[in-house]
Amino acid sequence: YHHHGYVEFDCRERFFDEGVNRDAIVYLTLANKLIHDLRPDAITIAEDVSGMPGSCVKPEEGGMGFDYRLGMAIPDYWIKILKEKSDEEWNIWEIWTVMTNRLPSVKTVAYAESHDQALVGDKTIAFRLMDKEMYFAMNRASENLVVERGMALHKMIRLMTIATGGDAYLNFMGNEFGHPEWIDFPREGNNWSYAHAQRLWSLSTNGFLRYSQLGEFDRAMIRLVKRNRVLQNGYPWRWNTDYDNKSQTFSHKNLLFIFNWHPTASIADYITEVPRPGKYTLELTTDDIRFGG
């Protein structure tokens, strides 16, 4: 575009009006053609906030030739509601809409956070949820309500993102185990310091800290999604959105997902519509003691 793509694409024509930089599209199309001709195994990903139609269609079919685009609205949304709304104000219908707002022809990479959140100037989701408590209350023996809430939401946000947000999933530099701090590369503004130009991967293997529980949840979540080929199955199917109880039920492939976003209520014997009658087995729960409860 001749702009940054942060406009209201309220009709199809907005993707093809005079705001479109046609020279840039030709260049990107030729670049994708060259890359895939030279390296058929290569994957190219568009960092495009608009979700332009045709961006992930082959050039021979009139598209730009990217394999995927980044679902940039998803991490922006999570940070927005964490910054601006209390738990009681979360709109579960809005969550569903943002997660599933993509064109079927544009294969989307879903992710909960990336450099916009992790680099200096913002906070990772884990740090925004738990802040200074992460420095002294991440020991497994500690009991801390801020950490318990933060870990619960961190797991739910990642699970919701991978289950509904796209056709691929991206972890980013330690968010799979809730890395606490930001990334800051050496520059004049920090006196060329390397102090934050790192990720402390040892946190995820330290058996005394809760980071390993968040990491174990991530591995279990990805195993479940890969085993059931959820990301190859298009869109999830919504069965229930209970605004009063802040609960959601949806299916994807042969999995049924039930989310309770309510900050205080745990509803016993909850009744919800399901795709088909029968017995269901519990494959994954964020409440598992292995994942920090």
Which role fits each region the language model picked out?
Residues 287-293:
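Solvent-exposed beta-strand/loop surfaces of large extracellular or lumenal domains
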